[in-house]
C-alpha cells in the first residue's frame, strides 16, 4: 500500500457540507485553473499539500492555500488520526483528495505518482522571505481546470512568544479557505465518485456567497464581505503560508 493511501480502517467523511493573494476572494464558487501544486515539509516533519489557483475571469487573481496531509513525527507521520477508537482522514487530506479527484478523477495517492522536482517560492526562515526552492510538484494537476467553493475568513495573526509558541498578536488578517472542489462541469468530487447529479455547488453558493467567517478572537460570527473590507487584507501578507507550524 502506498504511504499516501488511507488504511481500510479509516472512516471517510463528507467535506461537502452546505454549512453556514492580493485581496482575498469573496466567499463563493469559482471556476479556476491550477497554477501549481507542490509538497512542503515543516520542522515537525508534517507534510503540506500547497496549491496556487488562478481565477478564470474577473481580476484573474491568485488564491494560495496549504492543506496538511500528513502529521508530524510526534504524531506518527500519519495521513489520519484516531478519535474514540476510530480512524479518520486528516481534514487537510480530505480536502486535498477532493481536489485530486475533481481535477484528474484519481485519488491523492495516485496523483503523488506524478511528482516532479520543481522550483517554487517557499518561505525561508533564515532570509525571512520567500526564496526559490526545489520541491515535489504534482504535475498531473497543473494547468487543469477546477471549480472550487471558497470561504473568506478573518483569523488572528500569530507570532512566537518567549517560549517559542505561536500566540495571537492582537491583529487579524483576511484569508481564503477552500471547502471542496469539483470538475469544470460542476460536479463535486463526491458527486463524481458516487455518480450523483451536480447539486452541491449551487446549494453551497446560495447559503455562503458573500459571507465572511470571523475566527479572530477580537470578533466572532459571520458578516457580509462589504462589512469587513476595513480589516487587514492579504495584501499585507507577503510572507509564506509556512511561517507557522501545522496544528498536527
Which residues are covered by each model-predicted region?
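Short beta-rich binding modules
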Residues: 1-248
Amino acid at each position: 500500500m502506498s504511504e499516501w493511501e488511507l488504511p481500510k480502517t479509516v472512516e471517510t467523511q463528507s467535506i461537502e457540507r452546505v454549512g453556514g493573494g492580493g485581496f482575498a476572494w469573496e466567499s463563493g464558487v469559482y471556476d479556476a485553473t491550477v497554477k501549481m501544486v507542490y509538497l512542503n515539509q515543516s520542522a515537525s516533519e508534517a507534510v503540506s499539500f500547497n496549491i496556487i489557483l488562478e481565477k478564470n475571469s474577473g481580476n484573474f487573481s491568485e488564491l494560495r492555500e496549504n492543506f496538511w496531509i500528513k502529521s508530524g513525527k510526534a504524531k506518527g507521520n500519519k495521513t489520519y488520526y484516531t478519535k474514540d477508537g476510530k480512524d479518520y482522514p486528516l481534514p487537510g487530506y480530505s480536502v486535498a483528495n477532493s481536489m485530486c479527484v475533481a481535477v484528474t478523477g484519481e485519488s491523492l495517492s495516485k496523483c503523488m505518482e506524478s511528482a516532479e522536482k520543481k522550483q517554487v517560492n517557499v518561505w525561508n526562515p533564515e532570509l525571512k522571505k520567500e526564496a526559490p526552492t526545489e520541491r515535489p510538484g504534482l504535475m498531473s494537476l497543473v494547468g487543469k481546470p477546477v471549480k472550487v467553493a471558497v470561504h473568506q475568513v478573518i483569523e488572528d495573526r500569530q507570532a512566537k512568544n518567549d517560549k517559542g509558541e505561536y500566540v495571537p498578536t492582537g491583529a487579524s488578517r483576511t484569508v481564503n479557505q477552500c471547502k471542496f472542489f469539483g470538475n469544470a462541469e460542476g460536479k463535486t468530487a463526491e458527486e463524481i465518485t458516487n455518480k450523483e447529479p451536480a447539486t452541491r455547488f449551487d446549494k453551497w453558493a446560495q447559503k455562503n456567497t458573500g459571507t465572511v467567517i470571523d475566527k479572530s478572537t477580537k470578533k466572532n460570527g459571520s458578516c457580509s464581505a462589504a462589512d469587513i473590507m476595513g480589516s487587514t487584507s492579504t495584501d499585507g501578507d507577503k510572507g509564506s503560508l509556512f511561517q507557522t507550524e501545522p496544528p498536527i
